[in-house]
């Protein structure tokens, strides 16, 4: 491994890759604020808990089949958590991410789902002995912070251009996490991030078409981030200006100049992981508040959704413009229904809190009949997670109005809240309570946890499959 290089005699300002690397490589448990560590443990619990509850979904099986075809089965490999078979670390990162992403209830940082990328990767690496469990939390936080800094700065522009934040910024996050887990020195960490900037991408069209590519993008981000870090550890010569250079990440994907100081200056001050949100319902993160508002409206209507003549739902323009959100159907997959504002609102008004069963009822006559009466409207005065519903109802002279000015704090649960959420999902999907006992023990014990608890938890769903 190349020797550590100091920056004391550097003539030019540090690049963004170098500043990210300095931050990530020097992250330690005692330099991460206690609230950020607590939130990281909540993210761990949520990630594993949602993956357990995703065992009935088909996406892991597809990814596992592909992994075994590409990488083969390895007796001494990393566990494919949905089946108990073993393959390469890269293979486990891909297959297991499809399980973590199976219900679409993974955590969200802005509009990116870093947990479904980072946790499968770090789990596989630690299981294979390619990293210490004591470095698990700092590596996880490094991924959230580096990926989150880019997402916060640029996702409104890249999302509008049709690029999905999770693979675009998650590939860089995964490289940061792997580099920190391996304790790569700053110069090799910078190389890992530069490599990841070259390997990142991912489009949103699958949401518009209601197809499944997005289910596998998170695993590919982990796999590509792993490759980026492995190449760096092996001595790759990588572009220092990978992010802000003339043909770098920011100009290529965002079509703007990169403000290195503005992005790097927030590291260690404005912690991205503290803004991570969790999803109470199996719908897109941007549909969580519309569902909550619809539940409130349903209560006011006494469950009589058939009396609704028209619904106007005002949302942030990013929400309305996001691929697949403003869509009336037809629907042939849950990838389409969980994104559609109209479907989510209609099924909630008719049936209450949505379940996977509700989201897969593509021919529900009541829902399909209500959808044409629901109209999403862009309102720049509303935040990303806020909404206002106005419903015209038979027998009422004035519209029934529900308004929710919500931000990330509404969905930023502590571990107790996460535990209640994932156990509720387990009841819905038939997961043994002991599985959640195991992952709670693991999250609580970090940084001195036993990964055997995680493997034991997933052993319960392997038997079920």
Tell where the protein language model's regions lie, with residue ranges:
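Hydrophobic alpha-helical hairpins/lids featuring a short glycine-rich hinge
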Residues: 97-152
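Well-ordered alpha-helical scaffold segments within catalytic/enzyme domains
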Residues: 54, 122-129, 175-181, 228-232, ...
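Flexible glycine/proline-rich, aromatic-decorated loop/lid segments
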Residues: 195-203
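Short, Lys/Arg-enriched N-terminal segments with co-localized hydrophobic residues
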Residues: 1-13
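Terminal-appendage/accessory-domain detector
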Residues: 10-111, 213-223, 230-465
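Well-ordered alpha-helical segments within folded domains of soluble proteins
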Residues: 115-123, 170-177, 223-227, 287-291, ...
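Structural helix-adjacent loops and short alpha-helical linkers that scaffold large soluble proteins
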Residues: 128-140, 183-190, 238-241, 302, ...
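Aromatic-lined, polymer-binding surfaces characteristic
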Residues: 146-172, 178, 218
């Amino acid at each position: 491994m190349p020797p550590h290089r100091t920056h004391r005699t550097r003539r030019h300002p540090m690049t963004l890759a170098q500043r990210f690397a300095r931050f990530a490589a020097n992250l330690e448990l005692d330099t991460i604020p206690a609230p950020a560590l607590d939130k990281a443990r909540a993210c761990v619990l949520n990630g594993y808990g949602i993956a357990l509850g995703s065992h009935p979904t088909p996406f892991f099986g597809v990814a596992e089949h592909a992994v075994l075809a590409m990488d083969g089965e390895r007796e001494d490999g990393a566990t494919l958590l949905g089946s108990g078979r073993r393959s390469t670390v890269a293979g486990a990162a891909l297959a297991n991410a499809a399980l973590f992403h199976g219900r679409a209830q993974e955590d969200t940082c802005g509009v990116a789902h870093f947990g479904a990328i980072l946790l499968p990767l770090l789990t596989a690496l630690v299981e294979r002995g390619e990293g210490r469990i004591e470095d698990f939390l700092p590596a996880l936080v490094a991924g959230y912070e580096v990926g989150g800094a880019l997402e916060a700065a640029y996702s409104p522009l890249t999302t509008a251009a049709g690029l999905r934040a999770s693979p675009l910024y998650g590939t860089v996050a995964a490289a940061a996490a792997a580099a920190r887990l391996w304790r790569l020195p700053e110069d090799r960490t910078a190389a890992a991030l530069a490599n990841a900037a070259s390997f990142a991408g991912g489009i949103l069209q699958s949401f518009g078409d209601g197809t499944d590519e997005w289910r596998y993008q998170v695993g590919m981000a982990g796999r590509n981030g792993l490759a980026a870090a492995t190449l760096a550890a092996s001595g790759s010569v990588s572009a220092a200006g990978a992010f802000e250079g003339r043909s770098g990440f920011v100009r290529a994907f965002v079509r703007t100049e990169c403000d290195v100081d503005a992005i790097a200056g927030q590291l260690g001050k404005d912690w991205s992981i503290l803004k991570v949100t969790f999803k109470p319902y199996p719908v897109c993160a941007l549909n969580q508040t519309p569902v909550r508002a619809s539940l409130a409206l349903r209560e006011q209507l006494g469950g009589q959704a058939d009396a609704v003549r028209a619904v106007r739902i005002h949302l942030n323009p990013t929400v309305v413009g996001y691929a697949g959100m403003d869509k009336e159907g037809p629907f042939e997959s849950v990838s389409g229904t969980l994104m559609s504002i109209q479907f989510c609102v209609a099924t909630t008004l008719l049936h209450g809190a949505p379940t996977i069963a509700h989201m897969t009822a593509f021919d529900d006559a009541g829902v399909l009949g209500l959808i044409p009466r629901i109209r999403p409207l862009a309102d720049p005065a509303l935040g990303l997670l806020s909404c206002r519903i106005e419903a015209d109802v038979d027998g009422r002279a004035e519209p029934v109005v529900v308004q929710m000015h919500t931000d990330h704090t509404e969905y930023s649960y502590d571990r107790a809240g996460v535990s209640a959420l994932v156990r509720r999902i387990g009841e819905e999907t038939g997961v043994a309570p002991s599985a959640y006992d195991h992952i709670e023990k693991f999250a609580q014990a970090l940084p001195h946890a036993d990964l055997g608890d995680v493997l034991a938890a997933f052993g319960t769903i392997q038997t079920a499959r």
